[in-house]
């Protein structure tokens, strides 16, 4: 949870390291090294929790890894792409975007505290925290600021599963058990 991986790119500055001491930033020279490290880290956890990971993060990682200049084979990628979701070969992927955009969760579980289904809107409404704002494009950020931005998004995503005595995870487990469905199908 307290790591950030970034890719060194020509013409992009390092910037100032304003990360808290307990956060480790690893800067990779090649995209292949970065992706291999991400995939290795994914194997360390039984659950991978994302916010809109089905539509962005997982497909991005999956297809970038297979680009000829990167050259990671499909067999080495721990992600399995399905028609409308991403699953894992070893573990469970929970996409919180799908969970929080479920009207029953939005209205009954969380009292309609949020009306937009973005990480920022849900985080502000439920945990009173927000994404880091910046000017310009994300690709223009110096590497340490990019690491800080990405780590904050990951932290917010985790906190959404952890607040109120792990309320969301408990709800997902109960619905999964009652519906006799895998937790990644429920989410």
Predicted ranges, named:
Residues 2-10, 14-18, 40, 47-143, ...:
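Metal-dependent phosphoesterase core characteristic of DEDDh/y 3'-5' exonuclease domains
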Residues 30, 95, 118, 184-187:
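Secondary-structure junction/capping motif
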Residues 137-187:
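Common nucleic-acid-contacting/processivity interface regions adjacent to the catalytic cores
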Residues 12-32:
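Glycine-rich phosphate-binding "P-loop"
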Residues 29-45:
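Short, basic/hydrophobic alpha-helical segments
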Residues 23-25, 78-79, 158:
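Hydrophobic transmembrane signal anchors and adjacent membrane-proximal interface regions, especially
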Residues 4, 23, 186-187:
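Intrinsic disorder/low-complexity detector
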């Amino acid at each position: 949870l307290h790591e950030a991986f970034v890719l060194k790119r020509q013409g992009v500055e390092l910037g100032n390291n304003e990360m808290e001491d307990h956060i480790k930033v690893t800067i990779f020279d090649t995209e292949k090294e970065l992706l291999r490290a991400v995939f290795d880290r994914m194997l360390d956890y039984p659950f991978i929790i994302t916010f809109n990971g089905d539509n962005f993060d997982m497909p991005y990682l999956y297809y970038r890894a297979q680009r000829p200049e990167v050259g990671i084979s499909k067999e080495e990628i721990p992600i399995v792409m399905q028609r409308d979701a991403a699953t894992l070969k070893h573990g469970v992927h929970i996409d919180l975007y799908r969970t929080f955009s479920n009207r029953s969760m939005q209205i009954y579980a969380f009292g309609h505290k949020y009306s937009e289904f973005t990480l920022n809107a849900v985080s502000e409404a439920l945990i009173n925290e927000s994404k880091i704002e910046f000017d310009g494009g994300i690709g223009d950020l110096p590497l340490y600021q990019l690491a800080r931005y990405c780590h904050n998004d990951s932290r917010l995503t985790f906190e959404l599963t952890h607040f109120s005595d792990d309320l969301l995870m408990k709800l997902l487990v109960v619905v999964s058990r009652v519906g006799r469905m895998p937790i990644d199908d429920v989410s």
